[in-house]
C-alpha cells in the first residue's frame, strides 16, 4: 500500500500501482473528469502514471491538477507543441522534428525541412491541429531501451531525435510518448491524458530561423512559435495584450519619436539621435543625483584591459564566449570589458583601506560590450553595447544587511519616481557548483534575506539559482500591460575580492577581505529606456520627454510672439521648440502628437495680443488658455524631476521659517 497526503493535510492509503485517475475517481466522478495531471512531492506526473513506492519521494504530498491550476498551463503548452509537430508531419511528409519546449506565454517547435514554411502555411497547420484535438488521441508514456530507441528513430528518418538519445547520460531513462497509434516523440513528460485535453485555445504566431542546439555552425532549422492557454477567454486576452504590445513597441516609437536607430554595420550598437540622447541624459542625470545623495562615489574605468586581468577575475573562463578580444601590434591580448567589477577592485586596491572607510560605495555608468547572436538581439533592449548603472559596495560582513536594506529602499524609490513598481523579488540561493565554504554561504544568504525582510520585501525562493560566487536578489517590474521585466540586481560576492586581492585593515590591525555587493537598479540604460517607452507608449512624464513643449503657430503673424514664448520656456529649463511652418494647425498638432510631444502650446494673433498660450496635452481633448507666466509656472513645476521636486518641498518650509 502507498500513503498519500492531500493539500488539506488528510491522508489516504491506496494499492501499489494505483494511478492519479484512480485517486481522483475515489474522491468524486466530477474530479475524475476534470483531472489532467498529478503533483507528487512537488513534481508533475502523468495522470495515468502508476504510483509505486519507488516513485514516491518520501514526503508523499499528493495533489490532483485540473485545468484551472497554473501548473497545468505549462503542460498544456508543451502538449500543444506536440500537436503542432504531429500536424506539421502530417501536412509536410519528410519533415524532421527536433525540440519543442513550452516557453513563457506559449511554445515553439524546431523543424528540419528543405523547403521553408510561409506565413500562409500557419492557418493550414492550425486547422490540422484542431482536427488532432478533435480526434482525442490518447497520450501514452513508454520507457524504451536506449539502443532500440536510437534504431527506431533512425528508421523513422528522425536523425535529430536519435542524436539526442545518444547524447543523454547513460543513467537516464529513455521515455517516448505515443500520441494516438501513429505518432510518437522522445520526451521526458509529463503530458495530458489525450489531445482533447489540450483544447483549442491556441494560435500560431510567427516563424523564425534557428540553429540545431543554438550553434550557428550546426544545421539551420525552422521554428514555429505559438501561444496556448487554458481557455478561449485567456487566449483572447493574450492576443489583445500582444496587439497592445505591438502598438507600444519601442522600435516603432524610436522611429516615430526620432530617438535612435540601429543599422547593419553596427549590429547591437545604438545610434542615439539628438532627442533620444536628450532622454538618455535626463535619465542619467537623475540617476547621478540619486546615487550622489545616497553616498556613492562615481568613477570611470577603462574600456579595454589586458586579458590577464579577466583571467584572474574568472570572467575569461565564465564569459569568454561573450567577450570581444583583440591583439595589439605588440602582441598584447586585450579584451573589451563585459562588466565593470574588476576595474572597481583595481581602484579599491590603490592605497591602504581602513575599516573606518567602509562601506565604500563605488558607482560607474559603465559602457560594456558583450557578444549576442544576431537572432537574440532586440531593438535597444538586447544589444551588444550597453551602459550599466553599475555600482559596487565594499563593506564588512556585519554591514551587509544594512547596506542591502539601504539599496532596496533606494531601488524602490527610483522605480516609484519612474512610474514603475516592483512585481516580485527573487532570492537565488547557493548553486551546486559554487565557491566558498557552506558556513560563509549560510551567513551570506541570511544577510540578504534579512535585508529584504527589513525592507518589507516578500521573497520568491529560487533554490540553487545563485551565482557561483554568492547569493543574489533579482527585482522585477510590472509594466502598464502586465508584463514583468527583471531589472535590478543585488549580488553578494566573497570570491572576486579574494581573486583580485582586495583587502582592508581591520580594527585589530589584521588584513581582511571586504565583502563586495554588486548592485544595479536600471540594469542598463538602453534596455530600461526601451521598457519606459513601452510602459508609457511613448507618452513619457514631462520631466523625461526629449521635447517637452512645442510652440505651434496658427498664422505667421504670431511668429515673433511664438519665439518669445519658446525663449521664456527655455530660460526656465523647459526643452521647447517652435513650429513656424506654413501648415494648418491641426496638421501640426497631429504630427507632434504622433511624435509624443507632451504639450503643444498653440499661439495665434489673439494669444499674441493677450500674452496668452493655449495648452493642448497629448491624448487630451481640447485646450486650456493661460497667461504666459501662469503657463511657464505650471510647466516648470511639472517638468521638475521628482527628486528635485522633493528637495524643494523640504527646503520650502525652512526658507519660510528663516523669513
Curated annotation (Swiss-Prot):
EC number, as in UniProt: 6.1.1.3
Cofactor(s) needed for function: Zn(2+)
One GO biological process term: threonyl-tRNA aminoacylation
Region (Catalytic): 249-541
Catalytic reactions on record: tRNA(Thr) + L-threonine + ATP = L-threonyl-tRNA(Thr) + AMP + diphosphate + H(+)
Annotated signal sequence range: none
EC top class named in words: ligase
Chief location: cytoplasm
Ranges where the TGS domain occurs: 1-61
Subcellular location field: Cytoplasm
Binding residues for Zn(2+): 341, 392, 518
Region span, Disordered: 637-659
Cofactor binding note: Binds 1 zinc ion per subunit.
Family affiliation: Belongs to the class-II aminoacyl-tRNA synthetase family.
Described purpose of this protein according to its UniProt entry: Catalyzes the attachment of threonine to tRNA(Thr) in a two-step reaction: L-threonine is first activated by ATP to form Thr-AMP and then transferred to the acceptor end of tRNA(Thr). Also edits incorrectly charged L-seryl-tRNA(Thr).
Subunit organization: Homodimer.
Xref: NCBIfam families: thrS
Protein name: Threonine--tRNA ligase
Organism from which the protein derives: Caulobacter sp. (strain K31)
Gene: thrS
Amino acid at each position: 500500500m502507498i500513503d498519500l497526503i492531500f493539500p488539506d493535510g488528510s491522508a489516504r492509503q491506496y494499492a501499489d500501482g494505483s494511478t492519479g485517475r484512480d485517486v481522483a475517481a475515489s474522491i468524486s466522478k466530477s474530479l475524475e473528469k476534470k483531472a489532467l495531471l498529478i503533483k507528487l512531492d512537488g513534481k508533475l506526473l502523468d495522470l495515468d502514471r502508476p504510483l509505486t513506492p519507488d516513485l514516491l519521494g518520501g514526503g508523499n504530498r499528493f495533489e490532483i491538477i485540473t485545468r484551472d491550476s497554473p501548473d497545468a498551463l505549462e503542460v498544456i503548452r508543451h502538449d500543444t507543441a506536440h500537436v503542432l509537430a504531429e500536424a506539421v508531419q502530417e501536412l509536410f511528409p519528410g519533415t524532421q522534428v527536433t525540440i519543442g519546449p513550452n516557453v513563457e506565454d506559449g511554445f515553439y517547435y524546431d523543424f528540419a525541412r528543405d523547403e521553408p514554411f510561409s506565413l500562409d502555411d500557419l492557418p493550414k497547420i492550425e486547422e490540422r491541429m484542431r482536427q488532432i484535438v478533435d480526434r482525442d488521441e490518447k497520450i501514452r508514456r513508454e520507457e524504451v531501451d536506449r539502443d532500440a530507441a536510437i534504431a527506431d528513430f533512425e528508421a523513422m528518418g528522425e536523425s535529430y531525435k536519435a542524436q539526442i538519445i545518444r547524447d543523454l547520460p547513460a543513467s537516464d531513462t529513455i521515455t517516448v510518448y505515443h500520441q494516438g497509434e501513429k505518432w510518437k516523440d522522445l520526451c521526458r513528460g509529463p503530458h495530458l491524458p489525450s489531445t482533447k485535453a489540450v483544447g483549442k485555445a491556441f494560435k500560431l504566431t510567427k516563424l523564425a530561423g534557428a540553429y540545431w542546439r543554438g550553434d550557428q555552425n550546426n544545421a539551420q532549422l525552422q521554428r514555429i512559435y505559438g501561444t496556448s492557454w487554458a481557455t478561449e477567454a485567456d487566449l483572447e486576452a493574450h492576443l489583445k495584450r500582444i496587439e497592445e504590445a505591438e502598438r507600444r513597441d519601442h522600435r516603432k516609437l524610436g522611429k516615430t519619436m526620432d530617438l535612435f536607430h540601429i543599422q547593419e554595420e553596427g549590429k547591437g550598437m545604438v545610434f542615439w539621435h539628438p532627442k533620444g540622447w536628450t532622454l538618455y541624459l535626463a535619465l542619467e542625470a537623475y540617476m547621478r543625483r540619486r546615487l550622489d545623495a545616497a553616498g556613492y562615489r562615481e568613477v570611470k574605468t577603462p574600456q579595454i584591459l589586458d586579458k590577464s586581468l579577466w583571467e584572474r577575475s574568472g570572467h575569461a573562463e565564465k564569459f569568454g564566449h561573450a567577450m570581444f578580444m583583440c591583439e595589439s601590434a605588440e602582441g598584447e591580448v586585450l579584451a573589451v570589458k563585459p562588466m565593470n567589477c574588476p576595474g572597481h577592485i583595481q581602484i579599491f586596491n590603490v592605497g591602504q583601506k581602513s575599516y573606518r572607510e567602509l562601506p565604500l560605495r563605488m558607482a560607474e555608468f559603465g559602457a560594456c560590450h558583450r557578444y549576442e547572436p544576431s537572432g537574440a538581439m532586440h531593438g535597444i533592449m538586447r544589444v551588444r553595447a550597453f551602459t550599466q548603472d553599475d555600482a559596487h559596495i565594499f563593506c564588512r560582513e556585519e554591514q551587509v544587511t544594512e547596506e542591502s536594506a539601504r539599496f532596496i529602499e533606494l531601488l524602490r524609490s527610483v522605480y516609484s519616481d519612474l512610474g514603475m513598481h516592483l512585481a516580485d523579488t527573487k532570492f537565488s540561493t547557493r548553486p551546486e557548483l559554487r565557491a566558498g565554504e557552506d558556513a560563509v554561504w549560510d551567513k551570506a544568504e541570511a544577510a540578504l534575506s534579512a535585508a529584504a525582510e527589513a525592507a518589507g520585501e516578500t521573497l520568491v525562493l529560487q533554490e540553487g539559482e545563485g551565482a557561483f560566487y554568492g547569493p543574489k536578489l533579482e527585482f522585477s517590474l510590472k509594466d502598464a500591460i502586465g508584463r514583468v521585466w527583471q531589472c535590478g540586481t543585488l549580488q553578494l560576492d566573497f570570491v572576486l575580492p579574494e581573486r583580485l586581492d582586495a583587502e582592508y585593515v581591520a580594527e585589530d590591525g589584521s588584513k581582511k577581505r571586504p565583502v563586495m555587493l554588486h548592485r544595479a537598479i536600471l540594469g542598463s540604460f538602453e534596455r530600461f529606456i526601451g521598457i519606459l517607452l513601452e510602459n508609457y507608449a511613448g507618452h513619457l512624464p514631462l520631466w523625461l520627454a526629449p521635447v517637452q513643449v512645442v510652440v505651434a503657430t496658427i498664422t505667421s503673424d504670431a511668429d515673433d510672439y511664438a519665439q518669445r514664448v519658446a525663449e521664456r520656456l527655455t530660460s526656465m529649463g523647459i526643452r521647447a521648440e517652435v513650429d513656424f511652418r506654413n501648415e494648418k494647425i491641426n496638421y501640426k498638432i497631429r504630427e507632434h502628437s504622433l511624435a509624443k510631444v507632451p504639450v503643444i502650446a498653440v499661439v495665434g494673433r489673439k494669444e499674441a495680443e493677450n500674452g496668452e498660450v493655449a495648452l493642448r496635452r497629448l491624448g487630451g481633448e481640447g485646450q486650456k488658455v493661460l497667461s504666459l507666466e501662469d503657463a511657464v509656472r505650471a510647466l516648470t513645476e511639472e517638468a521638475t524631476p521628482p527628486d528635485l521636486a522633493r528637495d524643494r518641498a523640504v527646503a520650502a518650509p525652512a526658507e519660510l521659517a528663516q523669513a
